[in-house]
Amino acid sequence: KNFGLYRERTGAMTLISENEAAAKVATTQIAAAARAMYSMPPDHGAAIVQLILSNDALRTEWDTELTEMRDRINGLRAQFVKQIQSIGIDQDFSFIEREKGMFSFLGVDVDQVQALVNDHSVYLVNSSRINVAGINDANIEYLANSLATVLKV
């Protein structure tokens, strides 16, 4: 996903097993599952990744962009937690700042999620997973205030 190739079916699977025999059995089962989905996996995404990683200039550009995005998301996490704390939410949401990646779970229940969606137009899934990358200066205060409102109900 770091390459933004969501529809290209790129990826890797790592298998850890107790011994070589178990690894062979698991590999056979994984291959059978892959064949059931498609007999010839697409190569376009993998070819793009290979091109980027094998070219020093492209790899440097990709790494720079990835670092910028990671720093942006980490900054958003910190800003969101600071905003939550500044409005006086009693619960500890500092875990959001310590997490990694584009998504975070708010740890609210399904009724609170539905209140965020229906009453505040804050969109997240029932598990309370939000896309941190979707937070910005224009909506961070609204998001924190909406969260505070549903937590008080």
Where are the regions a protein language model picked out?
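A structural signal for short secondary-structure junctions
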Residues: 42-43, 95-98, 124
